[in-house]
Structures are given as C-alpha cells and as structure tokens.
Amino acid sequence: MTQTLDTREDPLNLGGGGGGGCGCGWAHSASLSSWSSCHRRRPGAPAYNRPHRYSPKTEYGPPRKQPKQQHGPGFWFQPPVCSNWGCWGGPWRPPPPGFWKFPCPVQVFRVYGLHPLCFCCCSCWSGSWNPGWVKPPGRKKRWGRRGRGLRHHPRHSYPRSPPADVSTLPRPVKLYEWREPGMRAPPNTTQFIMNQIYEDMRQQEKVERQQEALRAQKATVSGEASPARSSGNDAPPGGSKETWGLQETLYGFVQNPSLAFSPNPEENQSLAPLLVEEEEEKKNDDEEEYDQEVCDAKEASEEEEEVEDEEEEVEDEEEEEVEEAEYVEEGEEELEEEELEEEEEVLEENEQRGEEFHLPLEMPLSIFVEAEEKRENFISCTFLNPEQIIPKVPQESLFMAQDFNC
C-alpha cells in the first residue's frame, strides 16, 4: 500500500491521489487531478527546462503564469451586466435641458479623463466611470527590452536630408551689368554671346586701324629722311647710283624686316595722305550715319507723338460728345421728373381741397363730371349719351331714408 506524499492533491492523506472520501487506499498509476487551462509543471521536470513546444524563448525562463491580455477586434472593455449602482452608475451624462444654467459664457476645453459631453467643473474631471474613455493599458518600459519591437522608434517617418549647400544654388540674374563669376547667364544667352563677339570684332578693327596709321606715319618720316641723305651724298662711294640704291634697300631689309614688302618712299608719301583722307571720310560717314539715325529717331518719335496727340484729341472729342449726350439725357430726365412732381402736387392739392370743401348733400355730382369732360375728355363714348350715363332721377328719391323705427 503506497501512500502519496503530495498534500496538495491529497490534503487529508487518505491514500490515493484525489481519492477524497471514497475509501480507496490504493494509489492510482496517474494522479487524477482536475483539468486546468493554465500550464502546470510535471512532477519530475525541472523548473527552468521544461519542454515548451511553441515558445520562442525556452531557454530564458518559464512562460507567463497568466496568459497575456490580447486586445481583440471588438471593444476591450464591456460594462458590467448588472451592478448595485443603479442610476448613478455608468458614465456621466448631462442633466435634462430643464436644469441647465449658464451663469457665464461656456468654455469647452479638453482634459484627460473628461467625458466629451461634460462642460461643467465637477468631480468627473478626475476620471470617468466608463474606462472606455481612458487609454487601454500599454506596455511598461523596461531597461534592455529594445528587441521586442523596433530597435529605434523613429521620430520622423522619413530620413532627415542633409542641409543643402548654398554655394551650389543658382544666383540671381544681372542682365545689363558686368557678370560676376558666380552669376548665371541671362536667359537670352545666345544673343548675349553674339553681342560680346561683335564687340570684340569692333575692338580688333579699331586696333588694326591705329596700327595702320602708325605705319603710315613711320613711312612718311623715313621718306623725308631718305631724300636728305641722297642730297648730302651726291657722289656715292664706289659703284653707280643703282648699286648704291640696291645696297640701301638690302640694308634696310636687314635692319627692319617689316619694311620688306613696304612700298617706295614716294608711294608712301602719296599713300599717307590717302589713308588719312580715307579715315577722315570713314569718320565723317560714321558721324553722318549717326546723325541721320538720331534725326530718324527724332522724326519717328515726333510722328508717334503727333499720332498720339491726334488720338487723344479724337478720344477727347468722343468723350465730350458722350458727356453732352448724357447731359441732354439728364436734362430730359430732370424735366420729366419735375413735370411728374408738379402733377403729383396738383393732384395732392385737389385732394386736399376736396377734403376741405364739404359739399352739401343736395348738390348733384354731375357738375364735376361735366367740368372734367370739358377740361379733359376722358370718356369718349359715342354710343352712350350723358343722359344715359347719368340718368335724371329725382333728388328726393336719391336721398330718401326709410324710417326703421316704425
């Protein structure tokens, strides 16, 4: 007869696991314990090394004693079915509209735990009966538990971009001034480049003209010096004049190679004034062209001004005509208004006179009708005589009043 030593399964030690008071003294081969949903340790297994089939952290420790509360798809809090609170239980709700009093302008502001329909200042600010308005319980932060979720919870949903380099950004545009190295070219870049090229060509032409003028001056000076030499040395030393001239030319070529293809001094003398005259003619032509352009521009501007003056005069005349027409229309309207006002005044005066002038009852009303017909023939009835319109009835019968007191 074997008795179990587990007092939890057999607290009275009656022999036999969970036998209770049945009187069975023999122990069962497997302990008959009540079934439970929570995990229980087998009797022979160690505390920290039990075989958990589906647990990812088998080596760290035992599983949770109670299953973790999982928030399902529905509401995470259901109010109690029945309670002792009666009508004072549940969330705060405003009183019926008959009890509302607003001593001051209502201020609506949000406080944690405040029911969205509560506008008063009372004890319900500390918290509401319905925990549905409170945030569901979150996970408590612990040290060294980063591996549960994201390693670094990002403050921004996008990665921060590095600050932009200001030196690489485009600079503003200068159209009509000297461009700095960092400045952008103007939008019409091709025109700008062509203008620069033409300006360079003009500068080059000017420099070439100056060089030609200097060469002409040098040629004239050398031409003046050569006849003085020939007059001083009448008898050339050895040889004829031709050989002496050849030697001079060769010596001149060796000394100044730029004169190798230069014309004779006489030609130079004749060419120098020609060049000067050509330059003067060119200058005069340029000045004349410039003066002509200026005159043309002035004439064009004067013509434009004349055309504008004529247009302005035409516009002024049209405006004056329109103003005159408007003035005439306004005068006609004023005359019509004055006539209407006079007619209204006459009618009002007639009405007032009629009200003030009390006619006797015996006086017939045909007088006014005849007067109106004479003044303005309102009624033009050819098929009705005035006797038919206003029949002659004895006046006594008109103003007869029956005696009702009889």
Swiss-Prot record:
A single Gene Ontology CC term: nucleus
Coiled coil residues, start to end: 199-225, 274-359
Signal peptide positions on this chain: none
Region: Disordered, residue numbers: 43-72, 138-167, 203-244, 278-358
Classification via InterPro entries: CCER1, Coiled-coil_domain
Presence of keyword Coiled coil: yes
One Pfam family it belongs to: CCER1
Function: Regulator of histone epigenetic modifications and chromatin compaction into the sperm head, required for histone-to-protamine (HTP) transition. HTP is a key event in which somatic histones are first replaced by testis-specific histone variants, then transition proteins (TNPs) are incorporated into the spermatid nucleus, and finally protamines (PRMs) replace the TNPs to promote chromatin condensation.
PANTHER family (UniProt xref): COILED-COIL DOMAIN-CONTAINING GLUTAMATE-RICH PROTEIN 1
Protein name, UniProt field: Coiled-coil domain-containing glutamate-rich protein 1
Lineage: Eukaryota, Metazoa, Chordata, Craniata, Vertebrata
Chain's gene name: CCER1
